[in-house]
Amino acid sequence: MTYPGILLKKQQLMARKELGQNFLSDPNAARMIVTKAGISDQDRVLEIGPGLGALTIPAAKLARDLVAVEKDTRLAGILMEELKRESIENVELINNDILHQDLNTLFRGEKIIVIGNLPYNISSQVLFMLVENRHLIKRAVLMFQKELTERISASPGGRDYGRLSVVMQYCSTVKKIADLPPHLFFPKPAVDSRVIEVNFFETTPYSGERERFLFKVIKAAFSKRRKTLRNSLAGGELDIDTKVSAKILETAEIDPVRRAETLSVEEYSRLSDALWSMHGSEEV
């Protein structure tokens, strides 16, 4: 593993702060992450944001094949050269934004393992994208800023509890693997990073249109986080008034003056059921 600073200096490049680029520079940490991903020679792997290849190279040596999606054209060029230098031929490198990548077309229904060191500015968006594509995912081993992982596992009523918490807890289990300090990266980030394993449930209470409606309700509730649920549900995407929202909350046995961050996943399911049952009436 070539030190990221050396690779960048050789190409007269700098990490792009606006893309949240902090490259893993410790080979032991990279091997640990790849090992925890449980990759075998039968597995297809998706790597999100491979950067300079810290995870790509050891993962590709274990996998059947690996698809790496990198937004930064400069890094894609450097990584291609590194793969050639290592004589690695089972990597497909795609220069694209992962948020614009169609995973169904890319993998055609095959189960995949997902790995990646995710920049903070798109971490939540990537997780929501993975939730939408979870039918493809065998498991995911991902690295985020520690703060983001605490939001995923937060409990109702806490400051960190939000839309991401509810959605992830509804459809997955998340396990901490390791915390990585700033000195293991180049350039050094200002905060600690955490590696987590995400395993999506085989089945969930809802699917298809019904699940999309649940997610819509959760998003609406948190869109006006400081307001009571009666007010946060009114208007916006749900297009109901405060009288109707109060009635729906009463049906769901939820106090209308509570706020979004106090509801459990089960309570959001009840709220969604109540809204869904009224959705075709003149009141909604």
From Swiss-Prot:
Ligand binding (S-adenosyl-L-methionine): 22, 24, 49, 70, 97, 117
Gene3D superfamilies: Ribosomal RNA adenine dimethylase-like, domain 2, Vaccinia Virus protein VP39
GO cellular component: cytosol
Places the protein is found: Cytoplasm
InterPro entries for this protein: KsgA/Erm, rRNA_Ade_diMease-like_C, rRNA_Ade_Mease_Trfase_CS, rRNA_Ade_methylase_Trfase_N, rRNA_adenine_dimethylase, SAM-dependent_MTases_sf
A molecular function (GO) term: RNA binding
Keywords: Cytoplasm, Methyltransferase, RNA-binding, rRNA processing, S-adenosyl-L-methionine, Transferase
SUPFAM superfamilies (UniProt xref): S-adenosyl-L-methionine-dependent methyltransferases (SSF53335)
Family to which the UniProt record says this protein belongs: Belongs to the class I-like SAM-binding methyltransferase superfamily. rRNA adenine N(6)-methyltransferase family. RsmA subfamily.
Function according to Swiss-Prot or TrEMBL: Specifically dimethylates two adjacent adenosines (A1518 and A1519) in the loop of a conserved hairpin near the 3'-end of 16S rRNA in the 30S particle. May play a critical role in biogenesis of 30S subunits.
Listed name of the protein: Ribosomal RNA small subunit methyltransferase A
Organism: Desulforapulum autotrophicum (strain ATCC 43914 / DSM 3382 / VKM B-1955 / HRM2)
Gene name of the record: rsmA
